[in-house]
Amino acid sequence: MRSGIIAKKVGMTRLFMEDGKQIPVTVLQLDNLQVVAQRTTEKDGYTAVQLGAGTPKIKRVSKAMRGHFAAQKVEPKRKLAEFRVSEDALIEVGAEISAEHFLTGQKVDVSGTSIGKGFAGAMKRHNFGGLRASHGVSISHRSHGSTGQCQDPGRVFKGKKMAGHMGAARVTTQNLEVVKTDAERGLVFIKGAVPGPKSGWVTVKDAVKKKAPEGLPFPAAVKSAATEAPVAEAPAEGGEA
């Protein structure tokens, strides 16, 4: 079982395919995504990797977290997330994960915090049909109606669909397709919409309900030192570059 990634939702656009079709996609950016820590069976009782992404203002990082990053010799991160992995899929601390972690055409599960809508009625929140426009209905046209209980059991069951706070909840959209990856810019293009607002953080994992394609980077697609280091231009003859 491989690790997932942390990505920032940049926004939506469209891509034109070779056959002329246009596909709506969500652009996700891997912002300096690194392995911050490992969790091992011997020490923690389970195996996982802790990833970090983004660059925070140092004054917003607590003293405890600064010590955590310093102990691992990793730059402070704005967003942290932990992914359960198998023992053979542990990644070295400090390794930077590339956008090529996923393959084109692969199915993934994307999790994020949905956009908050505030207090919403039953028609908007649960797609209820509402009551009749007339014939005995007064000022209750958009109400949810009866909650379904009488003297026995004499209460409303937990989980009953009613008006309440809508959105701002953890949502996972499954089996979304990876249309394209751009390792140079650290971008992953996902077909369709993903949960959350622009600039929101999401996690992307291999789809649990689909078979993983062959050729997946294992344990992860890690940027090499040669890729990270910029190539210096050779100085011109007889002078500096």
From Swiss-Prot:
Pfam families xrefs: Ribosomal_L3
Keywords linked to the UniProt accession: Methylation, Ribonucleoprotein, Ribosomal protein, RNA-binding, rRNA-binding
Record-level GO BP terms: translation
Reported modifications of this chain: Methylated by PrmB.
Positions of modified residues (N5-methylglutamine): Q151
GO MF entry, a single one: structural constituent of ribosome
Gene3D superfamilies according to UniProt: 3.30.160.810, Translation factors (2.40.30.10)
Entry's Gene Ontology cellular component terms: cytosolic large ribosomal subunit
Keyword presence, Ribosomal protein: yes
PROSITE patterns reported for this sequence: RIBOSOMAL_L3
Record function comment: One of the primary rRNA binding proteins, it binds directly near the 3'-end of the 23S rRNA, where it nucleates assembly of the 50S subunit.
Subunit structure: Part of the 50S ribosomal subunit. Forms a cluster with proteins L14 and L19.
PANTHER family assigned: 50S RIBOSOMAL PROTEIN L3 (PTHR11229), LARGE RIBOSOMAL SUBUNIT PROTEIN UL3C (PTHR11229:SF16)
HAMAP family, alphabetized: Ribosomal_uL3_B
Family listed: Belongs to the universal ribosomal protein uL3 family.
Protein name per its UniProtKB record: Large ribosomal subunit protein uL3
Organism field: Ruegeria pomeroyi (strain ATCC 700808 / DSM 15171 / DSS-3) (Silicibacter pomeroyi)
Gene: rplC
